[in-house]
Amino acid sequence: MAEPDRLVRVGAVDCGTNSIRLLVADIDRATGALTDVLRRMEIVRLGYGVDRTGRIDPDAMRRTLAMSREYAGQCASLGAEGVRFAATSASRDAANAAEFVAGVRDAFARFGTVPEVITGDE
């Protein structure tokens, strides 16, 4: 077992077209070894209707941002020092993607998280 001061607790959120996943883990600074503390996955259907309308559906955005706030609270209560948030297709392609990104920034403001909207290749 690593010495406690060698560990850093972090969170990572993967927000896709249909689900949003959370990983909170301890990383050993010396070895890079990762130990899961919490894993969650919820279906939010963020991409519902985006192909048809070109926009994130208001209910889908509300569901996803509510789960983002819940995940941020869990990261805080578990002592995460930072959180990385990566979002994919729906948040990249939608006309109202900026509204979604602003909501995520607000949800994770205590961590200074800037959501990363990754390319299709990433």
Residues covered by each model-derived region:
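Nucleotide/phosphate-binding catalytic cleft detector across ATP-hydrolyzing
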Residues: M1-C15, L23-E122
